[in-house]
Regions:
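An N-terminal hydrophobic leader/cap segment in hydrolases
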Residues: 12, 16, 21-73
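Short alpha-helix in the alpha/beta-hydrolase fold that links the catalytic acid
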Residues: 110, 240, 249, 263-272
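Conserved alpha/beta-hydrolase
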Residues: 111-133
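Alpha/beta-hydrolase active-site loop
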Residues: 137-158
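Hydrolase active-site cap/lid region
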Residues: 177-233
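Short beta-strand/loop motif that positions the catalytic acidic residue
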Residues: 246-248, 253-255, 259
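Catalytic histidine-centered segment of alpha/beta-hydrolase-like enzymes
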Residues: 288-298
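Catalytic active-site module of serine/aspartate enzymes centered on a nucleophile-bearing elbow/loop
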Residues: 296-314
Length: 314
């Protein structure tokens, strides 16, 4: 009888260990798969302006502008950008930062917008995108230091520079994260963010649920751990809200009312997170989907940005 009980316990433990091993193997496979989707370079940019868009003419105009290619090295990565000088000489420059799985070419309508408002425009490829080096996407965690490096680059070339940071989607969260860094040069005067997320953890948990119907545990936890192992950061560390709590720069926050990719609720969290006393403005564009506020209401978008820029980087 004793022997039978011992044998049964052994079989149960063997089955349990086998089940756990299978589950761990499945989770490991899923972790590597979703890490590849979320955090590994993909050279097929999404989000180009369609020919049917009311802003397609801006892309065509931008294509005809004289532009130079600028490069710098940060963290041993060579980074690439377009520089478009203003029609009339000015010390004022806007750094335009693209979003997830995009490159600088996707931002041409915004480059043209700021050019028409009279600013020099610098449009970098993020690390891991376009003509910049890097194999990984860091959701703003490392990218914020690249943006700071570009701001320093402009300031070194022209110590009289007055710089604005503009970002779209992941680029929006990137410029928000840069806002409170001590290494950000004083030449940076203000920030405009369009449809940025609160932090990478919130956004990836949201996407896992919305796109794949997957709960946060255990998969998002393990993908975040994979990010820590490969890139040195957990998803919670790429946080716009934490940065905004220390931000002293005037900021304009923009979001579409029908954004289901970065939910509209996140702009209100970001707005509330801005340090007390810091000038802040909010524009929620009615009926605009993710990263479509400019195309949905071009006049309102242009007027709001123009007024903000005239106030904080004239």
């Amino acid at each position: 009888m004793k022997f039978m009980k011992k044998s049964l316990r052994k079989r149960i433990w063997t089955i349990l260990i086998a089940i756990i091993s299978v589950l761990l193997s499945l989770n490991l496979g899923a972790t590597l798969y979703f890490y590849q989707i979320a955090c590994v370079r993909n050279n097929q940019p999404i989000g180009q302006v369609k020919t049917s868009s009311p802003n397609y003419s801006l892309v065509q105009k931008f294509n005809k502008l004289p532009k130079s290619t600028e490069t710098l090295t940060n963290n041993d990565l060579k980074l690439d950008a377009w520089y478009v000088p203003a029609e009339q000489k000015t010390n004022n420059t806007v750094i335009v930062v693209h979003g997830f799985r995009q490159d600088k070419s996707v931002m041409r309508q915004y480059g043209q917008l700021f050019h028409e408002l009279g600013y020099n425009v610098l449009m970098p490829d993020n690390r891991g995108a376009g003509n910049s080096q890097g194999n990984f996407i860091s959701f703003g965690y490392h990218d914020k230091f690249d943006v700071i490096a570009w701001a320093k680059y402009l300031t070194d070339k022209n110590p009289e520079s007055h710089i604005s940071l503009y970002g779209l989607s992941m680029g929006a969260s990137t410029v928000m994260m840069a806002s409170s860094e001590k290494s950000l040069p004083s030449s940076v005067k203000n920030i405009i963010e369009d449809c940025g997320y609160t932090n990478a953890w919130d956004e990836i948990v949201y996407q896992a649920k919305e796109s794949y119907n997957i709960p946060a545990f255990p998969l998002v936890y393990s993908v975040s751990l994979e990010s820590k192992i490969r890139q040195g950061w957990f998803f919670q560390e790429a946080s716009a809200t934490k940065a905004l709590a220390k931000d002293k720069l005037p900021i304009l926050l923009i979001h579409g009312s029908k954004d289901t990719y970065v939910p509209t609720s996140m702009v209100y969290e970001n707005y509330k997170s801005v340090k007390l006393g810091t000038p802040k403005e909010l524009l929620v564009v009615k009926n605009a989907a993710h990263a479509r506020s400019f195309e949905t209401n071009p006049t309102l978008y242009r007027q709001t940005i123009s007024k903000f820029m005239k106030t904080y980087n004239p």
